[in-house]
UniProtKB/Swiss-Prot annotation:
Organism: Salmonella schwarzengrund (strain CVM19633)
Source domain of life: Bacteria
Family, per entry: Belongs to the UPF0502 family.
InterPro entries from the UniProt entry: DUF480, WH-like_DNA-bd_sf, WH_DNA-bd_sf
Highest classification ranks of the organism: Bacteria, Pseudomonadati, Pseudomonadota, Gammaproteobacteria, Enterobacterales
NCBIfam families assigned to the protein according to its UniProt record, in alphabetical order: PRK11239.1 (NF008413)
Official protein name in the record: UPF0502 protein YceH
Gene3D superfamilies, A to Z: Winged helix-like DNA-binding domain superfamily/Winged helix DNA-binding domain
Transmembrane feature ranges: none
SUPFAM superfamilies: Winged helix' DNA-binding domain
Pfam family, one: DUF480
Length: 215
């Protein structure tokens, strides 16, 4: 597989994929928009504190690798960025809406169980049941042009195995186990995180609207 992203590149692409679906009226994103999305406190693991310069460097690298493209011209006072990572006109990677939702959530949050993924990805795609989540993960794991995700060995005392994306190369399962946050009542925690993320998104929309009205 030709995808060897750094953790920061994965964060940038994940943010653009997320905002393309959840806030299409703000997409494509400016550099400042990408910085804000990357450093969100909700629906991000780990939480990052990237500077504008660091984000600009990542954007420039991803444009050179044809994973992003710049959008400027009439009506755009600042350069904006849109993803060409998947489902672009000339790109090879084609994903369904369900696959985009899961890949995005894995890029933003790292290894997660199907239950966590269903809850956290719900704002991008409404999965009808757990079977749809699991079948989508299996498709991503068995694609001829992939695999794009891997099922990790189930940890002792856990009911579900976690899944991890492979866009940053092979997975070190031992380091993932030692760095995995302890989840108390996983489904409830996921619902709370989803609500917090929705509130943050609404605040961002309101700020954008107020700024627009003030122009």
């Amino acid at each position: 597989m030709k995808y060897e992203l750094t953790a920061t590149e994965a964060r940038v692409i994940g943010c653009l994929l997320e905002k393309q679906v959840t806030t299409p009226e703000q997409y494509p994103l400016s550099v400042n928009g990408v910085v804000t999305a990357c450093n969100q406190k909700t629906n991000r693991e780990p939480v990052m504190n990237l500077t504008e310069q660091e984000v600009q460097e990542q954007l420039d690298n991803l444009v050179k690798r044809h994973f992003l493209r710049t959008v400027s011209g009439f009506g755009n006072r600042v350069t904006k960025y849109e993803q060409r990572f998947c489902n672009s006109e000339f790109g090879d990677l084609k994903l369904s809406a369900a696959e985009v939702a899961l890949v995005t959530t894995l890029l933003l949050r790292g290894a997660q169980t199907p239950g966590e993924l269903r809850s956290r990805a719900s704002r991008m795609h409404e999965f009808s049941d757990m079977a749809e989540v699991e079948s989508t993960l299996e498709r991503l794991a068995s694609r001829e042009d992939g695999p794009y995700v891997i099922r990790l060995a189930r940890e002792p005392g856990k009911r579900e195995s976690r899944y991890m994306h492979l866009f940053c190369g092979d997975v070190d399962e031992l380091s993932l186990q030692t760095s995995a946050p302890e989840s108390a009542s996983g489904d409830l925690q996921s619902r709370v995180e989803a609500l917090e993320s929705e509130v943050a998104e609404l605040k961002q929309r309101l700020d954008s609207l107020l700024a627009h009205l003030g122009e």
